[in-house]
Structures are given as structure tokens and as C-alpha cells.
């Protein structure tokens, strides 16, 4: 996958998603000063560049999901740093709505709604990723700000929140990613990657804490296909989990080398094909292959083909 055929470049690649036509969408953080440069890039399933858009997220591009609603598909985008907003877009990049911090929650400094700046803290809004609820609406993780999970209806109206900063049993330290695990149809669960605690936390669909699953290396986000849960870990590997959240396989692991070698993130000459540096997001495509976006200086996307 390459954008060298276009006039654009990318920096730190953050998230990746696939639509029903197997087109690939990648968001990078970008640089705030490049105000006319896009944050979202679209490729065909062979990695050929198609188009780009989303300059409004430059310097803060982060979360990206494709969601089908009725007969249409939409992009949901979250942005942190100085942007501090989340949006619903068409697949061509037209904005349907954009929203800022939910002041109804009484969690945030009023500045987060009125005039966001690149300021961090537990009273700041730094949205990272989405999960979509089975009866409509969605959850939004404030993974770098207040550490809350917010619940919205299908129109983006804030309803409630749970979590916050704490010890890891219903509270978080960087709740970076999340997923609705509906592999048990009768009892869907919310799974949150509590990144700095190196765990997954499990909740019922109403947000009641159920369990903590340890043993990860900075888990960043989640995807699922069939009975397999996919967890990219910033600690240099991608894990596949069964219905009981037990590890089936770990792909591209380079944990020891990345931990013990300085500067790998910045030095492309130290990257190894098939080995990961810092997986920040991953998803299955329509063929069961896995796409991984990495938190490295010049961005990297890797495709792992399913063994058949």
C-alpha cells in the first residue's frame, strides 16, 4: 500500500477500516500546520490509492470506523490533540455532523466545547475510538482525556457515560479502544482495551463491570470476525482471541527487540517485514485477511493474508 502515486504523504498512521467493497480507509495524525493536507486516505483492496479527504482532522486524526446503517455505509471519525471532535461522514468524505465534548456529562472544562486547544488532562476531551451498539447508537472512548466511555444515540445525542480514571476494575488508565462482542448473541458484552493497565475490561451491554483479562502489551483496539477477536498491541504484536478471551495466536511478534532497541519507531531501516513495531489498530477485511496500521513516524500498513 502506497500513497507515493499521489501528491500526499502520511505521518503516524493510527486507524484502519474496510467497507463492503473491500476498500481500505486509513487515518493518520498529520501535522496541524498542513491545513490543506488530508487526514484520511482510501485504497482499493490491492493497495492502489483512490482518493483522500479530511483536512479538518490534521494534527489530531485518530479513530476511524465504517458502519452500515440501513442500505448505506458511513465513516465515523474521532480526532484528539487540538481538534477534540468526532464526526459522521459519507464514504466520500462529506460531513453529516461533527460534535465536540459532551458538556451534559459535566465532566469537561467548558473550553473543550467552546474553543478546544492542545491541552491534555482528565477534564479534557480526547476521543479515540468507537463501538456500535446492537440496537443502534454507539459508544465513544475518551481514551486520552477523561478516560470515560460515552454512550450516544444514532443521531449523536449524548445519553450517559461510565468509567473514568482508576485502578482497572471498572475504571481505566487509557481506555483506548473498544468493541461490542456479540459472539454470544444472548449476552453481548462491551470489551475495552485498558491500554496502560495492559488489560481488557469486560462489561455488560449497560456498562456494568464484569471482569478484567490481563496479559497484553498495551492493547490498542479490537475487531472481530466470526468467533475470533483481533487485538493489536502497541507492544509489537497482534493477538487473536477465542470466545473466552484466551490467546489462539500471536502474529508478527517482535516484543523483545522493540523493547530493547532504541529508536525503531523513527528509523525505517530497522523495520522488518512481517514483524511489528507498534500496532495501533487492526481489522479483518472481507476475505478474512488482516490489515494493521502502526504508530510509527512515517506510517506503515501491513496486510497479513489468511492461510487457506
Regions found by a protein language model. Name each.
Residues 7-21, 57-73, 106-137, 167-189, ...:
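Beta-rich, blade/repeat-based domains predominating
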